[in-house]
Amino acid sequence: MSNERYNARESEPKWQAKWDEAKIFATRNDDPRPKYYVLEMFPYPSGRIHMGHVRNYTMGDVVARTMRARGHNVLHPMGWDAFGLPAENAAIERKVAPKAWTYDNIASMKKQLQTMGLSLDWAREFATCDPTYYKHQQKMFLDFLKVGLAERETRKLNWDPVDMTVLANEQVIDGRGWRSGAVVEQREMNQWVFKITRYAQDLLDALETLDRWPDKVRLMQRNWIGRSEGLLVRFALDAATTPAGETELKIFTTRPDTLFGAKFMAIAPDHPLAQAAAAKNEKIAAFVEECKKRGTAQAEIDTAEKQGIDTGIRALHPFDPTWQIPVYVANFVLMEYGTGAIFGCPAHDQRDLDFVNKYQLGNTPVVCPEGQDPLSFVITDEAYDGDGRLINSRFLDGMSIADAKEEVAKRLETATLGNAPVGERKVNFRLRDWGISRQRYWGCPIPVIHCEVCGVVPVPDKDLPVVLPEDVSFDKPGNALDHHPTWKHVPCPQCGGKAQRETDTMDTFVDSSWYFARFTDPWNETAPTTPDVVNRMLPVDQYIGGVEHAILHLLYSRFFTRAMKATGHLGLDEPFRGMFTQGMVVHETYRTADGHFASPAEVAIVAEGDGRRATLLDGGTPVEIGPIEKMSKSKRNTVDPDDIIGSYGADTARWFMLSDSPPDRDVIWSEEGVKGASRFVQRLWRMVNDAAAIARSAPAERPATFGPEALAVRKAAHGALDKVLSGIERLAFNVSLAHIREFANSFGEALAKPGQPSPDLAWAIREAAVILVQLFHPMMPHLAEECWAALGRPGLVSEALWPQIERDLLVEDSITLPVQVNGKKRGDITVARDANTQEIEAAVLALDAVRQALDGKPVRKVIVVPQRIVNVVG
């Protein structure tokens, strides 16, 4: 066997230069071949790529290279999600301009990505912070504005008085801003929103068509959209207990069948009725203020202790006006959900039960499980939310839940309060319109002007883009655009009078909600898309990214595609045909005696008995080996891709990232695993060189017949070809790599046999070597190019078409059949695939297991189901 070592440091830059020179990854929009668009979620230019990037982009590259080899016109672009808060933080902390910081990071990360050997069309590269990109985003905003998909509305928002910006609910922790630590205020503010709720039902229904998306992602979106059918019920308020002017309280419920179990009403702290009550009661006012300080993220509200205060207001039961229900202000009701008010039926809702137990309001069960005695059915600490029959509900008693819901709806639809029905059937959605206003500098400017005379005036198309000024100062907190002395002051486009630009910028999720469409023709200077091109190249056939983007990014992109269709920018509804969410890259953590984390590069690990011992390389101090966690800077358990690529080569890193775990699961980083991948690279190199020496003696023409040895080599090669391709098509990359290893093992055995191979075997070895190189090319393209050249093949393997599978070679010569005696399995038998019935019968009856099962009884008949099963009847 050859002892020559493969030198990745020399090979990889050489082949990358050849690919660039030949422009083999550039995609032509007019290419007549069937298109295939593969896209990994583009990165934020933080400054360095991490191993998660390596895994993500390697997966996409395997798909791109495979589909290119199979004759598709592959679009595989790359760009930069370049706006965002970290650039402003860098400007504040390091006194560097956001633009300069961003583009320096892009240059560094691009260089890193290029060392990975990714088959990207860099000619289509753009950054979302470039005015040539956001010019078109501003144009689409104005188009959305014209058709009512963008609006300005007043919302109650979380305001950080130190950072002077609006915070999302998830950014408020224990009532304080996640970054500044300041107590967050609730402020009513003007906010630009996209009307995503207009498409709520369509976005929900279309999830059924996305059969190449993970079920968990579709479920997350389904829950986020949150469609519920129910009843809007208007409760009259007792005039004697209610502030002047308040006459009714509206609630939306999906369980109108439980109305007779109502024990309290709960309203949000910012509900108008709560505000009216607080104006006349200091205790209520104090409770409302305390609620404003709490976190507003749904997860935090769900886990917080349920608290409330009785307003003294009483609501009247819609079926019995003598039945008064106390109205509480509660910390678990949000104004933005439903009507900002609920009725509590504690017997059948755990949250409500916890609440009434705390305030001793009691509970009355109104749904009894089938078979349970209604008289003895009680609720104490655990609510019952199952099916059953109605009890303690007057005219509903004995009904099923479904029938009771219908009966309540019918009665309340015909009852009136004032001049309107008490009840109204409604479909409610949890989904809320998308607020896009951000009080930040480093984002896409919103292209509107505010005039005291004309109001909100769109920036004329001819004046786009509205470009961010570069001479900004971050000496003051808040939005640098607000402080700019000249940028925001402009004449009104309509009346010419004094006016001001909108100083809010767009949520960065807007930038990433249409970038996939821009990649189809990023050279179009006059429009966001070129209709015939975008409609031909979209949807993205395979999108790859983290599950953390399952809701917001993916849902916003689905909305944006519909909005772009409504405004004439493209002609389809769904942006991504296939979606794949890869797992994370995880690593052990290491902690010193003083509690500080140590990086893997600072730690030495040795085996000790049945375990392992870790020490610091510098000084030998013992280190605690901690749990395996996601790689993060805070835990210092990251591995620098540059170090791995510099030591082992990009192909080794790529192979390891694909081989160790199913791609949708986390991969545990292991230095031993990387070394194993490196050894396999060297083994393949030696193997191909050995095969190349044999191939030089092979006949040019295909032999007319093949002997057993040659046939075995060919069967293994074509079997691997079939299995590896199947794995890639299913994105089961680890399975494909296992089949490559399996084939390499059998091929290595064939190469190791002594003596000069026969002409037919030499021909088969040459064919198998070519197939082997093409099989690992998508995963290890640099090694594949070097091996391709060693085999004397013309051109580049990156341009070669996938080998044709000879299906007749996939048929096994023998087949294994299960054998039953009187319907009970007794064993298996392996026979020639073309064996006739008589031969199979004879072989079966000769089996010891069959003779023992018959125990001397005569054979009545033998039933042979061809290539399926044999049953002996005795």
UniProtKB/Swiss-Prot annotation:
Positions annotated to bind ATP: 633
Coiled coil spans: none
A Gene Ontology BP annotation from the UniProt entry: leucyl-tRNA aminoacylation
Superkingdom of the organism of origin: Bacteria
Primary localization: cytoplasm
Reactions the enzyme catalyzes: tRNA(Leu) + L-leucine + ATP = L-leucyl-tRNA(Leu) + AMP + diphosphate
E.C. number: 6.1.1.4
Protein name per its UniProtKB record: Leucine--tRNA ligase
Residues making up the signal peptide according to the UniProt record: none
UniProt motif 'HIGH' region: location: 43-53
Cellular-component GO terms for this entry: cytosol
Keywords of this entry: Aminoacyl-tRNA synthetase, ATP-binding, Cytoplasm, Ligase, Nucleotide-binding, Protein biosynthesis
